[in-house]
Amino acid sequence: MNNIVKIPQIITILSEHSSEHKFGFNSDIFEANVINILLLLFGLIYVLKQFLGSSLNARQIKVLAAIQESEERLEQASARLSESEKQLAQTQIIIDQIKKEAQLTAGKVRSSILAQGQLDIERLAITGKSNIETAEKQIRRQIQQQITFLALKRVTLQLENQMSSEMQLRIIDNNIAKLGDQL
């Protein structure tokens, strides 16, 4: 309400001021063509409203279409992201299973290698023991053969020294008689 009271006061001050300085506000509406100006202004607003309204409507439709397209792309991207997250989770599960299987397989292989190594060690120990026993038997045989050879040599030398030609003839005759009895 204060503004309405002030407007006539402002108009009065301007009209008084204009008469003194040759510039001012003409308060006669018909003389100042205020009605024509108002009609022109309302006509412009009406025409511009229709023109700008159609432009704004077209712009609004484009903006809404762009927003809808963006929302659709967002939904598609969200769906792809969700699918990718599912695939990542499945891949992670598969990776974990592969790791577990690899650990189990590595444990089995390690156990198998250790068991095979233990068997190889036992077999080598048995083979080594067998080789040692065989070597001992061969050495004993060689020693026995050497002892037998040396004993025979000694006996032969003693017999040659102690045996006379008469004893030799008796042994030969005795052997011939034994052979004759067998035939």
From Swiss-Prot:
Gene Ontology terms, MF aspect: ATP binding; proton-transporting ATP synthase activity, rotational mechanism
Cellular compartment(s): Plastid, Chloroplast thylakoid membrane
Domain of life according to the entry: Eukaryota
Native species: Pyropia yezoensis (Susabi-nori)
Membrane topology reported for the UniProt record: Single-pass membrane protein
Keyword Ion transport listed: yes
GO cellular component: chloroplast thylakoid membrane; proton-transporting ATP synthase complex
Purpose: F(1)F(0) ATP synthase produces ATP from ADP in the presence of a proton or sodium gradient. F-type ATPases consist of two structural domains, F(1) containing the extramembraneous catalytic core and F(0) containing the membrane proton channel, linked together by a central stalk and a peripheral stalk. During catalysis, ATP synthesis in the catalytic domain of F(1) is coupled via a rotary mechanism of the central stalk subunits to proton translocation. Component of the F(0) channel, it forms part of the peripheral stalk, linking F(1) to F(0).
Subunit organization: F-type ATPases have 2 components, F(1) - the catalytic core - and F(0) - the membrane proton channel. F(1) has five subunits: alpha(3), beta(3), gamma(1), delta(1), epsilon(1). F(0) has four main subunits: a(1), b(1), b'(1) and c(10-14). The alpha and beta chains form an alternating ring which encloses part of the gamma chain. F(1) is attached to F(0) by a central stalk formed by the gamma and epsilon chains, while a peripheral stalk is formed by the delta, b and b' chains.
Claim: Transferase is one of the keywords in the record: no
Family membership noted in the UniProt record: Belongs to the ATPase B chain family.
Extra facts: In plastids the F-type ATPase is also known as CF(1)CF(0).
HAMAP family the UniProt entry points to: ATP_synth_b_bprime (MF_01398)
Entry's transmembrane regions: 28-48
Pfam families: ATP-synt_B (PF00430)
Protein name: ATP synthase subunit b, chloroplastic
Entry keywords, A to Z: ATP synthesis, ATP-binding, CF(0), Chloroplast, Hydrogen ion transport, Ion transport, Membrane, Nucleotide-binding, Plastid, Thylakoid, Transmembrane, Transmembrane helix, Transport
